[in-house]
Amino acid sequence: FDDDTFTDDLPRAEAIAREMGKLGVTWSCNAKANVPYDTLKIMKENGLRLLLVGYESGNQQILHNIKKGMRVEVAKEFTKNCHKLGIKIHGTFIVGLPGETKETIQETIAFAKEINPHTLQVSLAAPYPGTALHKQATENGWLNVDAAELIDENGVQIAPLHYPHLSHTEIFESVEEFYRKFYFRGS
């Protein structure tokens, strides 16, 4: 289920899970990193295989800045519960969000390593026109006008944001660093 709000209504999510269980199929869905253990258990017992979870950042202030409505400690407990139940996690993270620094990027990488999703995806903050991020970036001079298209001619995402303390090049290069430090860490 590709629905960012799938787990917002827990009774609905549990009812859908039970119906999927009757069908005997395995399935996956998007989830916020705050689903309680009992709901996760119902979902797993009814065929849930994988959750796609938008963690975004491991820094509480960054999460507050983007109005994520999530606490890092809650996300850690949620992830621990998923591992306990055998639910696979594809975690998604974003670098270059408002307030980002070299230190917060390292904090998010450490967070990802600690919670240990099975796979992850790292994206660049993308200030799409009409969004609050675009307005904020324009008003504060954070938007690199040369990268206003958000992708290059090959479809590769560009880091259009920069901050006084963090360049768009540093933000862009942090994506590869994130993948490298997560996937090539020692055991």
Residue positions per predicted region:
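Active-site groove signature of glycoside hydrolases
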Residues: 1-2
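A structural motif corresponding to the C-terminal lobe/cap of the Radical SAM core domain
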Residues: 5-11, 15-186
